[in-house]
Protein backbone atom coordinates (compact mmCIF):
# COMPACT_ATOMS: atom_id res chain seq x y z
CA UNK A 1 0.00 0.00 0.00
CA UNK A 2 1.35 3.42 -0.96
CA UNK A 3 2.32 5.69 1.92
CA UNK A 4 -0.01 8.62 2.42
CA UNK A 5 1.61 11.95 1.77
CA UNK A 6 1.75 14.21 4.82
CA UNK A 7 -0.39 17.19 3.83
CA UNK A 8 0.84 20.25 5.65
CA UNK A 9 -2.23 22.45 5.56
CA UNK A 10 -2.56 23.26 9.27
CA UNK A 11 0.09 24.53 11.66
CA UNK A 12 1.83 21.69 13.52
CA UNK A 13 2.22 21.56 17.31
CA UNK A 14 3.86 18.96 19.58
CA UNK A 15 2.07 18.17 22.83
CA UNK A 16 2.11 15.43 25.45
CA UNK A 17 0.42 14.21 28.60
CA UNK A 18 2.33 14.54 31.89
CA UNK A 19 1.37 13.82 35.51
CA UNK A 20 1.40 11.26 38.29
CA UNK A 21 1.16 7.53 37.60
CA UNK A 22 -2.45 6.23 37.40
CA UNK A 23 -4.00 9.69 37.22
CA UNK A 24 -5.24 8.84 33.72
CA UNK A 25 -2.72 10.16 31.17
CA UNK A 26 -3.06 7.21 28.83
CA UNK A 27 -6.85 7.00 29.24
CA UNK A 28 -7.06 10.69 28.34
CA UNK A 29 -4.87 10.16 25.27
CA UNK A 30 -7.20 7.35 24.16
CA UNK A 31 -10.28 9.51 24.83
CA UNK A 32 -8.90 12.40 22.75
CA UNK A 33 -8.33 10.12 19.74
CA UNK A 34 -11.78 8.53 20.11
CA UNK A 35 -13.73 11.78 20.44
CA UNK A 36 -11.84 13.49 17.60
CA UNK A 37 -12.27 10.40 15.40
CA UNK A 38 -16.04 10.99 15.56
CA UNK A 39 -15.41 14.23 13.67
CA UNK A 40 -12.97 12.57 11.27
CA UNK A 41 -9.98 14.32 12.86
CA UNK A 42 -8.15 11.30 14.26
CA UNK A 43 -7.88 7.54 14.23
CA UNK A 44 -9.22 6.13 17.48
CA UNK A 45 -6.49 4.40 19.47
CA UNK A 46 -7.45 2.09 22.33
CA UNK A 47 -5.87 2.25 25.78
CA UNK A 48 -3.97 -1.00 25.17
CA UNK A 49 -2.50 0.25 21.91
CA UNK A 50 -1.17 3.37 23.62
CA UNK A 51 -0.09 1.58 26.79
CA UNK A 52 2.18 -0.97 25.13
CA UNK A 53 4.62 1.74 24.13
CA UNK A 54 7.37 0.60 21.80
CA UNK A 55 10.97 0.94 22.96
CA UNK A 56 12.88 3.71 21.28
CA UNK A 57 16.52 4.58 21.41
CA UNK A 58 17.32 8.25 21.84
CA UNK A 59 21.06 8.92 22.04
CA UNK A 60 21.69 5.40 23.30
CA UNK A 61 19.00 5.54 25.95
CA UNK A 62 16.05 3.20 25.91
CA UNK A 63 12.77 5.07 26.23
CA UNK A 64 9.23 3.79 25.98
CA UNK A 65 6.96 6.31 24.29
CA UNK A 66 3.80 6.27 22.26
CA UNK A 67 3.16 8.86 19.59
CA UNK A 68 -0.37 9.51 18.39
CA UNK A 69 -1.47 12.16 15.95
CA UNK A 70 -4.73 14.01 15.63
CA UNK A 71 -6.17 17.25 14.36
CA UNK A 72 -8.54 19.93 15.52
CA UNK A 73 -10.27 22.33 13.14
CA UNK A 74 -7.29 24.65 13.59
CA UNK A 75 -4.15 22.54 13.99
CA UNK A 76 -2.34 19.25 13.52
CA UNK A 77 -0.94 17.67 16.70
CA UNK A 78 1.70 15.08 17.49
CA UNK A 79 1.00 13.81 21.01
CA UNK A 80 3.40 11.81 23.14
CA UNK A 81 2.47 9.59 26.08
CA UNK A 82 4.92 7.61 28.23
CA UNK A 83 3.98 4.59 30.33
CA UNK A 84 6.50 4.98 33.15
CA UNK A 85 7.80 7.85 35.24
CA UNK A 86 11.43 7.07 34.31
CA UNK A 87 10.43 7.29 30.63
CA UNK A 88 9.17 10.85 31.17
CA UNK A 89 12.39 11.91 32.85
CA UNK A 90 14.48 10.45 30.01
CA UNK A 91 12.16 11.81 27.34
CA UNK A 92 12.18 15.34 28.65
CA UNK A 93 15.94 15.45 29.23
CA UNK A 94 16.94 13.97 25.86
CA UNK A 95 14.29 15.97 24.02
CA UNK A 96 13.34 12.73 22.25
CA UNK A 97 9.84 14.15 22.11
CA UNK A 98 10.04 17.91 22.20
CA UNK A 99 6.85 19.45 23.63
CA UNK A 100 5.51 22.87 22.66
CA UNK A 101 3.00 22.46 25.45
CA UNK A 102 1.89 19.81 27.92
CA UNK A 103 -1.45 18.55 29.20
CA UNK A 104 -1.00 17.99 32.94
CA UNK A 105 -3.39 15.27 34.11
CA UNK A 106 -4.35 15.40 37.79
CA UNK A 107 -6.85 13.07 39.43
CA UNK A 108 -9.59 15.16 41.06
CA UNK A 109 -10.04 12.31 43.53
CA UNK A 110 -6.41 12.37 44.72
CA UNK A 111 -5.09 15.85 44.02
CA UNK A 112 -1.47 16.62 43.15
CA UNK A 113 1.00 13.82 43.98
CA UNK A 114 4.86 13.65 44.06
CA UNK A 115 5.23 12.99 40.32
CA UNK A 116 2.79 15.82 39.55
CA UNK A 117 5.29 18.13 41.19
CA UNK A 118 8.29 16.46 39.57
CA UNK A 119 6.81 16.67 36.07
CA UNK A 120 5.98 20.38 36.51
CA UNK A 121 9.54 21.01 37.73
CA UNK A 122 10.98 19.06 34.79
CA UNK A 123 8.77 20.96 32.36
CA UNK A 124 10.07 24.21 33.82
CA UNK A 125 13.71 23.12 33.62
CA UNK A 126 13.75 21.59 30.16
CA UNK A 127 11.76 24.46 28.72
CA UNK A 128 8.23 23.16 28.07
CA UNK A 129 6.71 26.61 27.65
CA UNK A 130 3.00 26.04 28.32
CA UNK A 131 0.88 23.77 30.50
CA UNK A 132 -2.88 23.22 30.46
CA UNK A 133 -4.59 21.08 33.09
CA UNK A 134 -7.13 18.28 32.84
CA UNK A 135 -8.65 17.43 36.25
CA UNK A 136 -9.55 13.82 35.62
CA UNK A 137 -11.82 11.31 37.40
CA UNK A 138 -14.40 14.01 38.19
CA UNK A 139 -17.04 11.25 38.14
CA UNK A 140 -15.52 9.90 41.36
CA UNK A 141 -15.93 13.18 43.27
CA UNK A 142 -19.39 14.14 44.52
CA UNK A 143 -18.43 17.32 46.32
CA UNK A 144 -17.82 20.33 44.03
CA UNK A 145 -15.88 22.03 46.84
CA UNK A 146 -13.35 19.21 46.74
CA UNK A 147 -12.77 19.84 43.05
CA UNK A 148 -12.28 23.55 43.75
CA UNK A 149 -9.75 22.65 46.42
CA UNK A 150 -7.74 20.44 44.06
CA UNK A 151 -7.90 23.17 41.43
CA UNK A 152 -6.42 25.67 43.90
CA UNK A 153 -3.67 23.22 44.86
CA UNK A 154 -2.73 22.71 41.21
CA UNK A 155 -2.64 26.47 40.55
CA UNK A 156 -0.41 26.92 43.61
CA UNK A 157 1.94 24.21 42.42
CA UNK A 158 2.21 25.77 38.95
CA UNK A 159 2.96 29.17 40.50
CA UNK A 160 5.71 27.61 42.64
CA UNK A 161 7.52 26.56 39.47
CA UNK A 162 7.02 29.89 37.70
CA UNK A 163 4.15 28.85 35.46
CA UNK A 164 1.22 31.32 35.46
CA UNK A 165 -1.00 29.19 37.73
CA UNK A 166 -3.76 31.79 37.99
CA UNK A 167 -4.19 32.08 34.22
CA UNK A 168 -3.69 28.40 33.41
CA UNK A 169 -6.82 26.86 31.86
CA UNK A 170 -8.19 23.92 33.88
CA UNK A 171 -10.78 21.56 32.39
CA UNK A 172 -12.67 19.23 34.73
CA UNK A 173 -13.85 15.91 33.31
CA UNK A 174 -13.50 12.15 33.16
CA UNK A 175 -11.45 10.51 30.43
CA UNK A 176 -12.87 7.10 31.30
CA UNK A 177 -16.51 8.27 31.07
CA UNK A 178 -15.79 9.94 27.73
CA UNK A 179 -14.22 6.69 26.47
CA UNK A 180 -17.18 4.63 27.71
CA UNK A 181 -19.73 6.99 26.15
CA UNK A 182 -17.86 7.79 22.95
CA UNK A 183 -20.77 9.66 21.35
CA UNK A 184 -18.37 12.50 20.56
CA UNK A 185 -21.02 15.20 20.86
CA UNK A 186 -20.04 18.62 22.18
CA UNK A 187 -23.17 18.82 24.33
CA UNK A 188 -22.46 15.47 26.02
CA UNK A 189 -21.58 15.76 29.73
CA UNK A 190 -18.36 13.74 29.29
CA UNK A 191 -17.38 13.90 25.60
CA UNK A 192 -17.96 17.66 25.66
CA UNK A 193 -15.15 18.02 28.20
CA UNK A 194 -12.68 16.48 25.76
CA UNK A 195 -13.75 19.05 23.15
CA UNK A 196 -13.36 21.76 25.77
CA UNK A 197 -9.83 20.53 26.50
CA UNK A 198 -8.94 20.58 22.80
CA UNK A 199 -10.31 24.12 22.46
CA UNK A 200 -8.10 25.15 25.38
CA UNK A 201 -5.04 23.48 23.84
CA UNK A 202 -5.82 25.26 20.53
CA UNK A 203 -6.18 28.65 22.18
CA UNK A 204 -3.67 28.61 25.03
CA UNK A 205 -0.64 26.83 23.53
CA UNK A 206 0.77 29.09 20.81
CA UNK A 207 2.05 27.71 17.51
CA UNK A 208 5.84 27.58 17.98
CA UNK A 209 8.18 29.65 15.88
CA UNK A 210 9.49 27.42 13.09
CA UNK A 211 13.21 26.60 13.05
CA UNK A 212 13.55 28.38 9.73
CA UNK A 213 12.33 31.67 11.25
CA UNK A 214 14.86 31.65 14.10
CA UNK A 215 18.29 33.33 13.86
CA UNK A 216 20.85 31.39 11.79
CA UNK A 217 23.00 28.75 13.51
CA UNK A 218 25.13 25.97 12.03
CA UNK A 219 27.40 23.65 14.05
CA UNK A 220 30.72 23.22 12.24
CA UNK A 221 31.44 19.59 11.39
CA UNK A 222 34.42 19.90 9.09
CA UNK A 223 36.74 22.53 7.61
CA UNK A 224 38.48 22.55 4.20
CA UNK A 225 40.61 25.04 2.41
CA UNK A 226 39.99 25.50 -1.30
CA UNK A 227 42.99 26.89 -3.17
CA UNK A 228 42.29 30.33 -4.52
CA UNK A 229 38.92 30.58 -2.83
CA UNK A 230 39.49 30.33 0.91
CA UNK A 231 38.13 28.35 3.84
CA UNK A 232 34.93 26.31 3.79
CA UNK A 233 33.08 25.16 6.93
CA UNK A 234 30.55 22.35 6.49
CA UNK A 235 27.62 21.27 8.63
CA UNK A 236 23.86 20.99 8.89
CA UNK A 237 21.95 24.22 9.40
CA UNK A 238 20.25 23.88 12.78
CA UNK A 239 18.02 26.92 12.44
CA UNK A 240 17.39 30.01 10.36
CA UNK A 241 18.70 30.76 6.87
CA UNK A 242 22.01 31.90 5.39
CA UNK A 243 22.92 33.49 2.06
CA UNK A 244 25.93 35.07 0.35
CA UNK A 245 26.76 38.45 1.87
CA UNK A 246 25.44 37.58 5.35
CA UNK A 247 27.64 38.44 8.31
CA UNK A 248 28.22 35.47 10.63
CA UNK A 249 30.08 34.97 13.88
CA UNK A 250 32.37 32.00 14.66
CA UNK A 251 31.67 31.04 18.28
CA UNK A 252 33.04 28.54 20.77
CA UNK A 253 36.31 26.87 21.87
CA UNK A 254 37.87 30.33 22.38
CA UNK A 255 36.78 33.29 24.47
CA UNK A 256 37.06 35.61 21.45
CA UNK A 257 34.34 35.23 18.82
CA UNK A 258 35.22 36.33 15.25
CA UNK A 259 32.97 37.92 12.67
CA UNK A 260 33.24 37.19 8.97
CA UNK A 261 31.15 37.37 5.81
CA UNK A 262 29.71 34.44 3.84
CA UNK A 263 31.10 34.58 0.30
CA UNK A 264 29.60 31.32 -0.94
CA UNK A 265 27.02 28.68 -0.02
CA UNK A 266 27.11 25.21 -1.58
CA UNK A 267 24.96 22.13 -1.25
CA UNK A 268 25.81 18.83 -3.00
CA UNK A 269 28.63 20.71 -4.81
CA UNK A 270 26.15 23.14 -6.35
CA UNK A 271 25.97 26.80 -5.42
CA UNK A 272 22.87 27.86 -3.56
CA UNK A 273 21.22 31.27 -3.20
CA UNK A 274 20.06 30.57 0.30
CA UNK A 275 20.34 27.61 2.67
CA UNK A 276 17.84 26.93 5.44
CA UNK A 277 17.28 24.80 8.55
CA UNK A 278 17.88 21.12 7.76
CA UNK A 279 20.23 21.66 4.80
CA UNK A 280 23.71 20.10 4.78
CA UNK A 281 25.94 22.80 3.36
CA UNK A 282 29.42 24.20 2.89
CA UNK A 283 29.94 27.87 3.71
CA UNK A 284 32.82 29.85 2.23
CA UNK A 285 34.14 32.37 4.77
CA UNK A 286 35.91 35.62 3.84
CA UNK A 287 39.40 36.21 5.25
CA UNK A 288 39.41 33.15 7.51
CA UNK A 289 42.40 30.79 7.62
CA UNK A 290 41.82 27.03 7.88
CA UNK A 291 43.14 27.05 11.47
CA UNK A 292 40.77 29.83 12.57
CA UNK A 293 37.61 27.73 12.45
CA UNK A 294 37.20 24.14 13.69
CA UNK A 295 34.75 21.37 14.42
CA UNK A 296 32.83 22.07 17.65
CA UNK A 297 32.38 25.76 16.93
CA UNK A 298 29.19 27.21 15.47
CA UNK A 299 28.49 29.78 12.79
CA UNK A 300 25.67 32.04 13.91
CA UNK A 301 23.98 35.34 13.27
CA UNK A 302 26.12 37.87 15.19
CA UNK A 303 25.00 38.58 18.75
CA UNK A 304 22.50 35.71 18.98
CA UNK A 305 24.49 33.16 21.01
CA UNK A 306 27.51 33.43 23.32
CA UNK A 307 30.26 31.06 24.48
CA UNK A 308 30.03 29.86 28.10
CA UNK A 309 31.93 27.51 30.41
CA UNK A 310 29.75 27.29 33.53
CA UNK A 311 26.19 26.05 33.55
CA UNK A 312 23.58 24.13 35.50
CA UNK A 313 22.00 21.07 33.91
CA UNK A 314 19.37 18.41 34.35
CA UNK A 315 21.04 15.07 33.80
CA UNK A 316 19.87 11.48 33.45
CA UNK A 317 22.62 8.96 34.23
CA UNK A 318 22.46 5.79 32.15
CA UNK A 319 22.06 2.43 33.86
CA UNK A 320 24.49 -0.44 33.41
CA UNK A 321 21.91 -2.11 31.13
CA UNK A 322 21.84 0.97 28.91
CA UNK A 323 25.60 0.74 28.50
CA UNK A 324 26.34 3.31 31.19
CA UNK A 325 28.53 3.17 34.28
CA UNK A 326 28.39 0.26 36.72
CA UNK A 327 29.42 2.45 39.64
CA UNK A 328 28.39 5.83 41.05
CA UNK A 329 30.30 9.06 40.46
CA UNK A 330 31.20 11.72 43.00
CA UNK A 331 31.86 15.45 43.28
CA UNK A 332 34.70 16.55 41.01
CA UNK A 333 33.99 13.81 38.41
CA UNK A 334 35.63 14.85 35.09
CA UNK A 335 34.02 13.29 32.03
CA UNK A 336 33.64 14.68 28.49
CA UNK A 337 30.59 16.71 27.53
CA UNK A 338 29.53 16.17 23.93
CA UNK A 339 27.86 19.32 22.54
CA UNK A 340 26.59 19.20 18.93
CA UNK A 341 29.77 17.99 17.19
CA UNK A 342 32.54 17.77 19.78
CA UNK A 343 33.66 16.65 23.24
CA UNK A 344 34.86 19.11 25.88
CA UNK A 345 36.18 18.05 29.29
CA UNK A 346 34.37 19.46 32.30
CA UNK A 347 34.21 19.11 36.07
CA UNK A 348 30.99 18.25 37.88
CA UNK A 349 29.75 19.77 41.12
CA UNK A 350 26.93 17.87 42.86
CA UNK A 351 24.08 19.65 44.68
CA UNK A 352 24.54 20.25 48.41
CA UNK A 353 23.76 17.16 50.44
CA UNK A 354 24.22 14.80 47.47
CA UNK A 355 27.26 12.60 48.06
CA UNK A 356 27.16 10.54 44.90
CA UNK A 357 25.11 9.86 41.79
CA UNK A 358 24.04 6.32 40.91
CA UNK A 359 23.39 4.91 37.44
CA UNK A 360 19.68 5.48 36.67
CA UNK A 361 19.50 8.72 38.71
CA UNK A 362 18.09 12.05 37.57
CA UNK A 363 20.10 14.90 39.07
CA UNK A 364 20.78 18.64 38.86
CA UNK A 365 24.48 19.29 38.25
CA UNK A 366 26.79 22.28 37.96
CA UNK A 367 29.44 21.92 35.30
CA UNK A 368 32.57 23.88 34.49
CA UNK A 369 34.07 23.22 31.03
CA UNK A 370 37.76 23.70 30.24
CA UNK A 371 36.91 25.54 27.00
CA UNK A 372 33.81 27.61 26.18
CA UNK A 373 30.98 26.29 24.00
CA UNK A 374 28.27 28.29 22.20
CA UNK A 375 25.44 27.66 24.59
CA UNK A 376 21.90 28.63 25.54
CA UNK A 377 19.25 27.24 27.86
CA UNK A 378 17.67 24.11 26.44
CA UNK A 379 20.84 22.91 24.67
CA UNK A 380 21.15 19.12 24.84
CA UNK A 381 24.40 17.23 25.45
CA UNK A 382 25.73 13.76 26.19
CA UNK A 383 28.17 12.90 28.97
CA UNK A 384 30.85 10.54 27.70
CA UNK A 385 33.70 8.58 29.15
CA UNK A 386 36.23 7.00 26.82
CA UNK A 387 33.87 7.35 23.87
CA UNK A 388 30.83 5.73 25.45
CA UNK A 389 27.76 7.65 26.58
CA UNK A 390 27.18 7.55 30.34
CA UNK A 391 24.58 10.31 30.65
CA UNK A 392 22.27 12.69 28.84
CA UNK A 393 21.62 16.26 29.85
CA UNK A 394 20.05 19.58 29.04
CA UNK A 395 21.35 23.03 30.01
CA UNK A 396 18.79 24.47 32.45
CA UNK A 397 20.66 27.66 33.43
CA UNK A 398 23.79 29.47 32.33
CA UNK A 399 26.07 30.61 35.15
CA UNK A 400 28.86 32.35 33.21
From Swiss-Prot:
<keyword id="KW-0251">Elongation factor</keyword>
<comment type="function">
    <text>GTP hydrolase that promotes the GTP-dependent binding of aminoacyl-tRNA to the A-site of ribosomes during protein biosynthesis.</text>
</comment>
<dbReference type="InterPro" id="IPR027417">
    <property type="entry name" value="P-loop_NTPase"/>
</dbReference>
<dbReference type="Pfam" id="PF00009">
    <property type="entry name" value="GTP_EFTU"/>
</dbReference>
<keyword id="KW-0378">Hydrolase</keyword>
<keyword id="KW-0963">Cytoplasm</keyword>
<keyword id="KW-0547">Nucleotide-binding</keyword>
<keyword id="KW-0648">Protein biosynthesis</keyword>
<feature type="region of interest" description="G2">
    <location>
        <begin position="60"/>
        <end position="64"/>
    </location>
</feature>
<dbReference type="GO" id="GO:0003746">
    <property type="term" value="F:translation elongation factor activity"/>
</dbReference>
<feature type="binding site">
    <location>
        <position position="26"/>
    </location>
    <ligand>
        <name>Mg(2+)</name>
    </ligand>
</feature>
<keyword id="KW-0460">Magnesium</keyword>
<dbReference type="InterPro" id="IPR009001">
    <property type="entry name" value="Transl_elong_EF1A/Init_IF2_C"/>
</dbReference>
<dbReference type="GO" id="GO:0003924">
    <property type="term" value="F:GTPase activity"/>
</dbReference>
<comment type="similarity">
    <text>Belongs to the TRAFAC class translation factor GTPase superfamily. Classic translation factor GTPase family. EF-Tu/EF-1A subfamily.</text>
</comment>
<dbReference type="GO" id="GO:0005829">
    <property type="term" value="C:cytosol"/>
</dbReference>
<dbReference type="InterPro" id="IPR005225">
    <property type="entry name" value="Small_GTP-bd"/>
</dbReference>
<dbReference type="InterPro" id="IPR004160">
    <property type="entry name" value="Transl_elong_EFTu/EF1A_C"/>
</dbReference>
<feature type="region of interest" description="G1">
    <location>
        <begin position="19"/>
        <end position="26"/>
    </location>
</feature>
<dbReference type="InterPro" id="IPR033720">
    <property type="entry name" value="EFTU_2"/>
</dbReference>
<dbReference type="InterPro" id="IPR000795">
    <property type="entry name" value="T_Tr_GTP-bd_dom"/>
</dbReference>
<comment type="subunit">
    <text>Monomer.</text>
</comment>
<feature type="binding site">
    <location>
        <begin position="136"/>
        <end position="139"/>
    </location>
    <ligand>
        <name>GTP</name>
    </ligand>
</feature>
<feature type="domain" description="tr-type G">
    <location>
        <begin position="10"/>
        <end position="209"/>
    </location>
</feature>
<feature type="region of interest" description="G3">
    <location>
        <begin position="81"/>
        <end position="84"/>
    </location>
</feature>
<feature type="binding site">
    <location>
        <begin position="81"/>
        <end position="85"/>
    </location>
    <ligand>
        <name>GTP</name>
    </ligand>
</feature>
<keyword id="KW-0479">Metal-binding</keyword>
<dbReference type="InterPro" id="IPR009000">
    <property type="entry name" value="Transl_B-barrel_sf"/>
</dbReference>
<dbReference type="InterPro" id="IPR050055">
    <property type="entry name" value="EF-Tu_GTPase"/>
</dbReference>
<dbReference type="GO" id="GO:0005525">
    <property type="term" value="F:GTP binding"/>
</dbReference>
<feature type="binding site">
    <location>
        <begin position="19"/>
        <end position="26"/>
    </location>
    <ligand>
        <name>GTP</name>
    </ligand>
</feature>
<dbReference type="InterPro" id="IPR004541">
    <property type="entry name" value="Transl_elong_EFTu/EF1A_bac/org"/>
</dbReference>
<feature type="region of interest" description="G5">
    <location>
        <begin position="174"/>
        <end position="176"/>
    </location>
</feature>
<dbReference type="InterPro" id="IPR004161">
    <property type="entry name" value="EFTu-like_2"/>
</dbReference>
<keyword id="KW-0342">GTP-binding</keyword>
<dbReference type="Pfam" id="PF03144">
    <property type="entry name" value="GTP_EFTU_D2"/>
</dbReference>
<dbReference type="InterPro" id="IPR031157">
    <property type="entry name" value="G_TR_CS"/>
</dbReference>
<dbReference type="InterPro" id="IPR041709">
    <property type="entry name" value="EF-Tu_GTP-bd"/>
</dbReference>
<protein>
    <recommendedName>
        <fullName>Elongation factor Tu-B</fullName>
        <ecNumber>3.6.5.3</ecNumber>
    </recommendedName>
</protein>
<feature type="region of interest" description="G4">
    <location>
        <begin position="136"/>
        <end position="139"/>
    </location>
</feature>
<dbReference type="Pfam" id="PF03143">
    <property type="entry name" value="GTP_EFTU_D3"/>
</dbReference>
